A protein has these predicted regions:
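Generic N-terminal segment detector
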Residues: 1-52, 207, 256-275
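Catalytic-pocket segment enriched in acidic/His residues
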Residues: 140-275
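Active-site microenvironments in enzyme catalytic cores
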Residues: 16-188
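Short, well-ordered strand-loop elements centered on a beta-strand within folded domains, enriched
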Residues: 1-4, 125-134, 189-194, 269
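Phenylalanine-focused residue identity feature
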Residues: 4, 8, 76, 88-89, ...
Length: 275
């Protein structure tokens, strides 16, 4: 739930508005609630029936990593150069981890990586209204074994993290000039770190949105992860106890501890709701 105009509403409600209507709500709220700090912890910026989708092989580094891991490398080279992008479903609201919440590596996977990504927050009218930080946790061993296993490598409980909030699109003048930094802490030390920029993104953001909405509808809006330009070198793999920190210019830092398997989540309640 999100405080707007002295009341609480869902983010899904806001994503049913047009971009102009949403700007008006944000401007009015900024005037009436200036200086009021949000109460309580930050939750994942997703709720209701809003879905998370993702684009793949949109950076050269991603294409190289997929070729490296796969027994059928040519399919990744072909999609990298094709007009049609790779788009796939990633998560529902209840499967998403928010800031500080654990992300999961599959218990039946031997090679797992975080994928730091710029995520587009898109309203029901296919307008980009905001941006957030995403972590598309993936099993390289499962996808590398057979590309048809991609849903198992990508779609499971807490394989996606979003946060720390949503930055309005009007506050990000050039989304193609954002530095993306990732650090993986292991035993309180940097186990891996790297940096890239959205300047390296091969696809245009509006093209990705157009393909996503071409034959689909999203009444509660949608969040679209735009692919990763950072992939840890072989044979690095995430381990339980690691912490992944992803920072994107103007959007903030998303940090999540790592657990192995859904059993590692225990009986933690889910904060993002889904009917």
């Amino acid at each position: 739930m999100w405080p707007f105009q002295a009341r609480f509403t869902t983010l899904a409600d806001l994503l049913r508005l047009s971009a102009d209507e949403l700007r008006g709500v944000i401007d009015e709220t900024s005037r009436t609630e200036a200086g009021q700090a949000p109460a309580g912890p930050y939750w994942a910026p997703i709720d209701g029936l809003t879905e998370v989708w993702a684009a793949g092989v949109t950076y050269q580094r991603s294409e190289e990593a997929r070729v490296e891991e796969s027994g059928t490398p040519d399919i990744y080279t072909r999609v990298y150069t094709a007009d049609r992008p790779e788009l796939f479903f990633k998560a529902t609201a209840r499967r998403v981890a928010g800031p500080g919440e654990p992300i999961v590596v599959r218990a039946d996977s031997s090679w797992d990586v975080p994928e730091p990504e710029l995520a587009l927050v898109i309203n029901a009218r296919a307008e980009i209204v905001g941006y957030t930080v995403a972590n598309d946790v993936s099993s390289r061993s499962i996808e590398g074994d057979n590309p048809l296993y991609l849903p198992q490598a990508k779609i499971y409980a807490r394989s996606c993290a979003l946060g720390p909030g949503v930055s309005p699109a009007s506050g990000v003048p050039d989304p193609y000039a954002l530095s993306i930094r990732m650090r993986i802490l292991r035993n309180e030390q940097a186990g891996w770190s790297g940096q890239t920029s959205t300047r390296e993104l091969k696809r245009r953001l509006d093209d990705l949105v157009e393909y996503l909405f071409r034959e689909d509808t999203f009444t509660d809006g949608v969040i679209l992860c735009t692919g990763t330009g950072l992939v840890p070198d072989t044979p690095f793999t995430l381990q339980a106890g690691d912490t992944v920190e992803i920072e994107i210019d103007q959007l903030g830092t998303l940090a999540n501890p790592v657990v192995r398997g859904k059993a590692g989540l225990g009986a933690r309640p889910k904060t993002s709701s889904e009917p």
